[in-house]
Design a protein with these regions (language model features):
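Conserved short alpha-helical segments that host acidic/polar catalytic motifs at enzyme active sites
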Residues: 1-204
């Protein structure tokens, strides 16, 4: 399983991103990650959280990261978010879900010109990387998200962070929630669970 949290703010978002992601810690026990975008571009931190909680592992990163846009995740499988450079531009991506037909999609990707995927421990393909590759098969991020959702057998919710903003997509059949909250200061967030943003002063 896992969970994710994203923030779009006119000011620095790192505080809200840190705690919003941390509030999803009960959904995963292996990896945690955050990416922010600001004047210096993308900044990312990923840590193993198997032997120490998210908050402890990321407290030093929070002091160094700066940005008004950010996404974070708790993952029970692969390290993420990933930062991708493609014909669609640079973006960071985080996913929650399961791809049942991953082998067929990888085989099709090789047939259509994708040259390689990075293997994780155990020989598995990173499903977040595969999702990014599917998105990149189209001419825009929204079209790519719709395409990925149409060919994935399973359930895949995702957050994409670009220099312009955040794309949030619930899985095609609505099995997993994606909720949007608004703060009185105008900041917006997207979350896997509403209590995570309620604790930060965001409203439904």
């Amino acid at each position: 399983m896992g969970g994710f949290f994203g923030v779009a703010s006119k000011s620095d978002c790192v505080f809200d991103l840190f705690f919003g992601t941390d509030y999803h810690s009960h959904l995963g026990t292996k990896r945690g990650g955050m990416v922010v975008y600001g004047k210096d571009g993308f900044e990312r931190a990923i840590h193993n959280i198997e032997n120490a909680p998210f908050r402890t592992k990321f407290e030093h990163d929070v002091d160094e990261m700066k940005g008004n846009l950010g996404i974070g995740c708790i993952s029970d499988t692969e390290p993420q978010p990933l930062i991708v450079r493609s014909h669609l531009g640079n973006f960071a991506i985080s996913t929650v879900g399961r791809i049942n037909n991953i082998d067929a999609l990888v085989k099709e990707a090789f047939t259509n010109g994708t040259t390689h995927f990075l293997e994780m421990s155990g020989g598995d393909i990173n499903p977040t990387e595969l999702t990014a590759a599917l998105i990149n098969r189209r001419d825009s991020i929204p079209e790519g998200i719709r395409y990925a959702q149409s060919v994935i057998d399973g359930s895949m919710s995702m957050l994409l962070l670009t220099p312009e903003g955040i794309y949030a997509a619930r899985d095609r059949l609505g099995r997993l929630p994606v909720l949007v909250g608004k703060h009185p200061d105008g900041s917006l967030c997207v979350s896997f669970e509403s209590f995570a943003y309620h604790k930060l002063g965001y409203e439904d």
